[in-house]
From Swiss-Prot:
Transmembrane segments: none annotated. This is ATP-dependent Clp protease ATP-binding subunit ClpX. PANTHER family: ATP-DEPENDENT CLP PROTEASE ATP-BINDING SUBUNIT CLPX-LIKE, MITOCHONDRIAL, ATP-DEPENDENT CLP PROTEASE ATP-BINDING SUBUNIT CLPX-LIKE, MITOCHONDRIAL-RELATED. GO terms for biological process: cell division; proteolysis involved in protein catabolic process. Zn(2+) binds at C16, C19, C38, C41. GO terms for molecular function: ATP binding; ATP hydrolysis activity; ATP-dependent protein folding chaperone; protein dimerization activity; unfolded protein binding; zinc ion binding. Component of the ClpX-ClpP complex. Forms a hexameric ring that, in the presence of ATP, binds to fourteen ClpP subunits assembled into a disk-like structure with a central cavity, resembling the structure of eukaryotic proteasomes. InterPro entries: AAA+_ATPase, ATP-dep_Clp_protease_ClpX, ATPase_AAA_core, Clp_ATPase_C, Clp_protease_ATP-bd_su_ClpX, ClpX_bact, P-loop_NTPase, Znf_CppX_C4. The keyword Metal-binding applies.
Length: 426
């Protein structure tokens, strides 16, 4: 019997039965009944099987569309609050992909595409909602910044580059890209503004809206396979955008005033209704009453508004919501930093007063949840710098005094008393 481990057969030179390489050309030759296979062919077989399994899983997941309640439940694991926005998004996304699953079947009814507009303050979770949806549905996803986009002929980024980015996310698989999701952020920044002093781009923003309009409503975009205009001889890829779900998001600062002006009853004289400036609703409550005409008055062109029929508004995050964001989601920041410290063999504890203080600081900065990471990074920077070089530290405790800068984190050593130093005077 041959030695199956070393590929030696009584001194004879052995060859792989699949690729024909000799035992000296490969690292390992494995013997079976009258056949041999080398390590390279084993790796190749594993790659083939892995690809086929992944394709089968992707195909099955495409047909297994989660119900709106299931989509919302998964969003709950990552996004705190914003219940109405989750419900609107869940139904819209469910209907969109249900429509795609039915598109090959002959039917008298043609289902239209419902793109989505997310309106909410900075750091309220617009981008996170879109990212989580794409991850849940296992479809290509890309983010574009509307402020960098220009119409053709101006200095800046062409709208077709959005589709290029989407293709890059799925290795230029056109079929996959045509099932993807595109999130366009800062969409409110391309509203028409006659006082825009810029001379290097479309000064009104209307040109960018017109260019995006064609992409969003459905067109066949020609995209070079490997970037830009450097190789004009390359054959362009044709991507049909009719089935790509576009989600546009923006803070729309000042939109609540447009809504309030519309909803406030007019009148003069003794019969007029008197309203103080302080009397009114929170911004989130006002945004919930938004209508297409309000968006047109804000500066979006009517055709563009018409292509975004599903509108979801997000509430401002209060202190309690920010504390929840710090601790509850699967990817909560406190859990992430605790994991980093755990890799050093150290426990990290945030006291409740510290979490409230971090939330208050984020509210003061008006950055919402987006500012939480930078606050924690600044607080933990020195500790993360020192801990890998220190021995016997078993726990780090963060309390309110650390957040306000009056003391350093409390370090607890193995078999010793906790130590904390006062922060140096500013």
């Amino acid at each position: 019997m041959t030695d199956t481990r070393n590929g030696e057969d009584n001194g004879k030179l052995l060859y792989c039965s699949f690729c024909g390489k000799s035992q000296h050309e490969v690292r390992k030759l494995i013997a079976g009944p009258s056949v041999f296979i080398c390590d390279e062919c084993v790796d190749l077989c594993n790659d083939i099987i892995r690809e086929e399994v992944q394709e089968a899983q992707a195909e099955s997941s495409a047909h297994k569309l989660p119900a709106p309640k299931e989509i919302s439940a998964i969003l709950d694991q990552y996004v705190i609050g914003q219940e109405r926005a989750k419900k609107v998004l869940s139904v819209a996304v469910y209907n969109h992909y249900k429509r795609l699953n039915q598109r090959d079947k002959k039917d008298d009814v043609e289902l239209g595409k419902s793109n989505i507009l997310l309106i909410g303050p900075t750091g309220s979770g617009k981008t996170l909602l879109a990212e989580t949806l794409a991850r849940l549905l296992n479809v290509p996803f890309t983010i574009a910044d509307a402020t960098t986009l220009t119409e053709a002929g101006y200095v800046g980024e062409d709208v077709e580059n959005i589709i290029q980015k989407l293709l890059q996310k799925c290795d230029y698989d056109v079929e996959k890209a045509q099932m993807g999701i595109v999130y366009i952020d800062e969409i409110d920044k391309i509203s028409r503004k006659s006082d825009n002093p810029s001379i290097t781009r479309d000064v009104s923003g209307e040109g960018v809206q017109q260019a995006l309009l064609k992409l969003i409503e459905g067109t066949v975009a020609s995209v070079p396979p490997q970037g830009g205009r450097k190789h004009p001889q390359q054959e362009f890829l044709q991507v049909d955008t009719r089935n790509i779900l576009f989600i546009c998001g923006g803070a729309f600062a000042g939109l609540e005033k447009v809504i309030q002006a519309r909803s406030t009853k007019g009148g003069i004289g003794f019969g007029a209704e008197v309203r103080s400036k302080q009397e009114g609703k929170k911004i989130g409550e006002s945004l919930r009453e938004v209508e297409p005409d309000d968006l047109v008055k804000f500066g979006l062109i009517p055709e563009f508004v018409g292509r975004l029929p599903v509108i979801a508004t997000l509430e401002e995050l209060d202190e309690a919501a920010l504390v929840q964001i710090l601790t509850e989601p699967k990817n909560a920041l406190t859990k992430q930093y605790a994991k980093l410290f755990e890799m050093e063999g150290v426990d990290l504890e945030f006291r409740s007063d510290a979490l409230k203080s971090v939330a208050q600081r984020a509210l003061e900065r008006k950055t919402g949840a987006r500012g939480l990471r930078s606050i924690l990074e600044g607080i933990l920077l020195d500790t993360m710098y020192e801990i890998p070089s220190q021995q016997d530290v078993s726990k780090v405790v963060i309390d309110e005094s650390v957040i306000d800068g009056s003391s350093k984190p409390l370090l607890i050593y193995e078999n010793s008393e906790p130590q904390a130093k006062a922060a140096p005077d500013a």
